[in-house]
């Protein structure tokens, strides 16, 4: 009786631990895709950005106007690539405390972020990326974010490195 119980517990543990391992591998792959997005912006690498975005995506940023109404900026795929890889200013975006939800071949990445331009703090907000798994890798199907300039929390990542 004890032997059967031990074997049953071991089988159950293996089933749950392998599912947990798969979920963790998916989480890491999603985080890697988001980090590639940030790297593409920082290095102005349009090719890298194109390799992780789904063509035809619609992307939206939201910032608050003086009257308290939201200002929504919509960018299609081509405009997003052009705007985010335009040469000129050094930019750095960092996210932390991410929440990742995965169901089958779709996922959501949600995290607070800060954004720096030419080494100086510019704004903060929340990033929301919707991703799909192509069978080979996770791709961003939509990027939406808030853009806030006031009441930004201190990043737990510390100061940016130059």
How should each PLM-predicted stretch be described?
Residues 108, 124-151:
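Short beta-strand edge/turn micro-motifs at domain boundaries
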Residues 2-9, 131:
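Sec-dependent signal peptide recognition
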